[in-house]
Amino acid sequence: MATDGLHENETLASLKIEAESLKGKLEEERAKLHDVELHQVAERVEALGQFVMKTRRTLKGHGNKVLCMDWCKDKRRIVSSSQDGKVIVWDSFTTNKEHAVTMPCTWVMACAYAPSGCAIACGGLDNKCSVYPLTFDKNENMAAKKKSVAMHTNYLSACSFTNSDMQILTASGDGTCALWDVESGQLLQSFHGHGADVLCLDLAPSETGNTFVSGGCDKKAMVWDMRSGQCVQAFETHESDINSVRYYPSGDAFASGSDDATCRLYDLRADREVAIYSKESIIFGASSVDFSLSGRLLFAGYNDYTINVWDVLKGARVSILFGHENRVSTLRVSPDGTAFCSGSWDHTLRVWA
């Protein structure tokens, strides 16, 4: 038995060495194709002019850190979740609260609006994803109509509806992502490949096919085929946890934000990292990233309470937005691109335009 164990260890060790050498060869092949930098290609592009954005609305009502938020497709309503165990639906025009749900646990780390605008999903330390239908009847008990959809073996870190209300994609601290049927709660596909907690995910724009990207504590960003459950591309250039990933509007690239204080842009067709957004003066991690509708700007929320706005093509910072009094934890551009909303550990959300 002992010799069997030795053989197994030797086999594992040799496989690890082989995997590393193959990785090295892959990197060499990638490097051969790496003939030009994005900022060199963008040299002829005109620089962006004066950039001004201000806080237009402040949403107050959470009793603790805001951890996640999402826009409704109607471009008006926002759902947010917090460490106080509450999930609130806001009217961003009037700052009124339209619905509130108290979850059975605190640390509600994930929330999402259904494409129809008729339901929300949320979850966190309860290890599951719950879906609540939204009605116009203010007296109706939303909790009574709750559906428990997804069950993980560790905390839920992110969730997102697919292009319909019928399926939901989740990411978890158990190192997996999963696709679920909302009606039956059945697991449709699971995605294994991360070596540590998965912290974030984003679905490819609907025109570009059935893929999504995830990032986690293993410093890897992975692109998955939702039909096969296979990882089709992986990128490992960050030096710390990846907190946020977001597809470029065309679906041909994605950005990531990490605790290593950088944001990076990966081109899926070139199969490599094409830009790094960083400055020596930025020493705090990036918690959340999102693109403007055109894809020219990258908004990034940081743990130093600021939001930095980057010129995607030139790699230069075009603005810093101040206002939050604690770390920015979540950030999303509205569906029509006219504004974006940020959530913070200072218990508030801010709408900027």
Curated annotation (Swiss-Prot):
The keyword Secreted does not apply. The keyword Chloroplast does not apply. GO terms for molecular function: G-protein gamma-subunit binding; protein-folding chaperone binding. SUPFAM superfamilies: WD40 repeat-like (SSF50978). Gene3D superfamilies: YVTN repeat-like/Quinoprotein amine dehydrogenase. GO terms for cellular component: nucleus; plasma membrane. WD repeats lie at residues 61-100, 103-142, 151-192, 194-236, 237-276, 278-320, 323-352. PROSITE patterns: WD_REPEATS_1, WD_REPEATS_2, WD_REPEATS_REGION. Signal peptide: none annotated. It is found in: Membrane. One of its GO terms (biological process) is negative regulation of voltage-gated calcium channel activity. Its main location: membrane. Component of a complex composed of RGS9 (isoform RGS9-1), GNB5 and RGS9BP; within this complex, the presence of GNB5 stabilizes both itself and RGS9 and increases RGS9 GTPase-activating protein (GAP) activity. Interacts with RGS7, forming the RGS7-GNB5 complex; within this complex, the presence of GNB5 increases RGS7 GTPase-activating protein (GAP) activity. Interacts with GPR158; promotes the GTPase activator activity of the RGS7-GNB5 complex in absence of glycine, in contrast GTPase activator activity of the RGS7-GNB5 complex is inhibited in presence of glycine. Interacts with RGS6. Enhances GTPase-activating protein (GAP) activity of regulator of G protein signaling (RGS) proteins, such as RGS7 and RGS9, hence involved in the termination of the signaling initiated by the G protein coupled receptors (GPCRs) by accelerating the GTP hydrolysis on the G-alpha subunits, thereby promoting their inactivation. Increases RGS7 GTPase-activating protein (GAP) activity, thereby regulating mood and cognition. Increases RGS9 GTPase-activating protein (GAP) activity, hence contributes to the deactivation of G protein signaling initiated by D(2) dopamine receptors. Belongs to the WD repeat G protein beta family. This is Guanine nucleotide-binding protein subunit beta-5. The lineage of its organism: Eukaryota, Metazoa, Chordata, Craniata, Vertebrata.
